[in-house]
Amino acid sequence: MDHTSPTYMLANLTHLHSEQLLQGLNLLRQHHELCDIILRVGDVKIHAHKVVLASVSPYFKAMFTGNLSEKENSEVEFQCIDETALQAIVEYAYTGTVFISQDTVESLLPAANLLQIKLVLKECCAFLESQLDPGNCIGISRFAETYGCRDLYLAATKYICQNFEAVCQTEEFFELTHADLDEIVSNDCLNVATEETVFYALESWIKYDVQERQKYLAQLLNSVRLPLLSVKFLTRLYEANHLIRDDRTCKHLLNEALKYHFMPEHRLSHQTVLMTRPRCAPKVLCAVGGKSGLFACLDSVEMYFPQNDSWIGLAPLNIPRYEFGICVLDQKVYVIGGIATNVRPGVTIRKHENSVECWNPDTNTWTSLERMNESRSTLGVVVLAGELYALGGYDGQSYLQSVEKYIPKIRKWQPVAPMTTTRSCFAAAVLDGMIYAIGGYGPAHMNSVERYDPSKDSWEMVASMADKRIHFGVGVMLGFIFVVGGHNGVSHLSSIERYDPHQNQWTVCRPMKEPRTGVGAAVIDNYLYVVGGHSGSSYLNTVQKYDPISDTWLDSAGMIYCRCNFGLTAL
């Protein structure tokens, strides 16, 4: 014998053993051998083994091992479970398979829910989700809510919202309660081409049983984004619909909507901001602060709606600032660092900030949050894995390469690995779980790019841009990073480049119609919106959007204010 060979072995037969065990137990059940429990539903008797049922069902385990009378019984009667469903559950316990169809799922899911068999319950929910259509999604939503199937309920609700125009024509829609209907039409994610669709859906629902339902008109009309309707539509509505004309609350709602169109100052009110929020967010741009002149530091904030190509004003910043970082986390806008300017007679005081402000779209208010560990202007800011990163910048004395991140759960800033070089006036972006720090100044104009891997807490250099850039815009779409505009130390730029992380190379795209420095950039629906900035001769409020598919530029409505070195984000 070769003494170098192992003298033992461990044979792993788990899969074969499990299969053989299940087959053996199932044969015993089918032949009624060693069975110690009978499950009875009406006249149907199902033979089984307590230990097998208890191993897959906490309900049966509690029944057979607890202090219940069934512990000693050899027969248990069920009155609230369908016999076919119970047979399917027992079959699953012995085989690991279960047959789910449109005919069986409505009885099988409640049985699996009662008996606490999570795997079967999960498969029933997945099957129902795969069957969603405009005619059954409301019923499935109610069914899921009844049995506490949260994921299925959310999926059905999402389907209702995404397919609302088809759903609102089905029989299930007309059988909704007014409370359920109000919940649906209040949803920000309702997918409608225009708000007119929402109104017509409500009108149809009321007319289905007008005597009983007209009392709910005012409540439901309050959930329609009336300011998004045209003046012509609102006027025609008042003239043609006697139910609205005869109701004081409805008339007030229409008057408030008309004020939005005829009284621009009314648009700054909290309620108007909420009622003009587009459906299917995130679909808006938010422009914050910046400069509109050499000494003009802005606190104003405005929002752009692509649906009607228009801007409205929002609540101003607590601290006027420019050259700050901006991002969105949990549908709230964060403004970080920057330069705050305090103008007094004969003197202008500039302060490099470490302060943080957060805008809540639900209340249209700004609140102060925990300050960064370092003051930073001209910094980069991104969100990765639910945490907010502040990179580099300038503190008033030194260019920075340090990086810190904000952890919302503990409300603290913590340092992470610094960049390989100091950077200010640069851009930061997230792509494929990596943070990119692009270009900037430190203390020379740069075209270099580095990438942070959070799993390693380390940075590495990647391909450099074609142009050196400071104060430029950045956006991520279609798996690429796009940079646009800025200044190269000699001139203002109109150029745009695209980075492919798989090829690790930059490609020059079609330039903008005019150069821009201190520009804002953000992505909506795979368009790169390029906003404001400075052309080299004037501050800009103009907006262009870039279509990467056709490599073309289109004009959009300009901002209310000219802005440079400001914050722009999509939410």
From Swiss-Prot:
Q: Give yes or no: UniProt keyword Repeat.
A: yes
Q: Which keywords does UniProt give here?
A: Kelch repeat, Repeat
Cited Gene3D superfamilies: 1.25.40.420, Kelch-type beta propeller, Potassium Channel Kv1.1, Chain A
A Gene Ontology biological process noted in the UniProt record is: proteasome-mediated ubiquitin-dependent protein catabolic process
What Gene Ontology molecular-function terms does this entry list? ubiquitin-like ligase-substrate adaptor activity
Is Hydrolase a UniProt keyword of this protein?
no
- Annotated GO CC locations: Cul3-RING ubiquitin ligase complex; cytoplasm
Could you tell me which residues the Kelch repeats occupy? 284-331, 332-386, 387-433, 435-479, 480-526, 528-570
- Domain named BTB is located at 35-102
Pfam family name, one: Kelch_KLHDC2_KLHL20_DRC7
Q: What is this protein called?
A: Kelch-like protein 28
**Where does this protein come from, organism-wise?**
Homo sapiens
Phylogenetic classification of the source organism: Eukaryota, Metazoa, Chordata, Craniata, Vertebrata
Gene from which this protein is expressed: KLHL28
